[in-house]
């Protein structure tokens, strides 16, 4: 289902805890997980150039890269990886983005802060692509 490209978009995703099966989901083993009330948020808009600017407010860090060079430059290069995955799914991006990321989810506390940010990022990209799509939760 195609939709119109928003000028500005805010996406929010909850963190989670594992009640049973921590670190087993990627092995295909059973997990009982539960969303928590703390959320990660991406607030962003399109740019007129091909630069991606990600302000990580909670960390006091800003990350920059060009859509023309999505080669991984560090371990866990999640934002480039997210764009690469979306491109493999057929999405295209002719312009970059300016985003601010904030999170209530504690880092390195077993509450899936990185996962929540990546789910928000993929959702944001799917809606801001040249031909936006509405993916269901399972697809994202």
Annotate each language-model stretch with its function:
Residues 1-115, 119-137:
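ATP-binding N-lobe of GHMP and related small-molecule kinases
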């Amino acid at each position: 289902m195609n939709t119109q490209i928003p000028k500005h978009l805010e996406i929010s995703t909850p963190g989670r805890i594992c009640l049973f099966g921590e670190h087993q989901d990627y092995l295909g083993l059973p997990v009982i997980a539960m969303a928590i009330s703390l959320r990660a948020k991406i607030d962003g808009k399109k740019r007129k150039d091909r630069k991606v600017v990600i302000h990580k407010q909670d960390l006091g860090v800003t990350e920059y890269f060009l859509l023309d060079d999505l080669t991984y430059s560090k371990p866990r290069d999640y934002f480039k990886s997210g764009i690469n995955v979306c491109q493999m799914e057929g999405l295209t991006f002719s312009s970059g983005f300016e985003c601010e990321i904030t999170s209530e989810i504690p880092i390195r506390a077993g509450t899936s802060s990185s996962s929540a940010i990546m789910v928000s990022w993929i959702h944001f990209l799917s809606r801001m692509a040249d031909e936006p799509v509405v993916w269901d939760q399972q697809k994202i």
